[in-house]
C-alpha cells in the first residue's frame, strides 16, 4: 500500500496529499487504510489505520492516526466484495486539470490501448451513487 502511494508520487501522478489506498485482508473482517493528513511520499506501514468490521466499525493505528476521510467509500466497495481486495483512489493532478479544461479524456486515450483498456478517466469512471445521511 505504501509503495503504491510512493510510486504514484514518484511518477508525478499525485501531489503529496492526493489519494488513498485500502486493502481487505482475505477471510477477515479487517481493512487497512492509508491515514488522513500524511504525505503520501513518506507513508509507511506503521502509519496505516486498521478498520475492524463487526457490529460496529472500529479504527486503530499504532501512531494514533485517523483513517482517510474517504474510508466510507473504501468500506462500501470492499465490505461485500468477493473478488476486489484493494481500492486505489488517486486524484492525478494532470487529469483533474484536463477535466476542468473541458477535454474529452475518454476520446483522447483511445489511440493508447494500454491506457484505454486499463484506465478510467472522465465520464467513463465507474461511480457509486451519492451517500445519503
Descriptions of predicted regions:
Residues 1-133:
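Glycine-rich flexible loops
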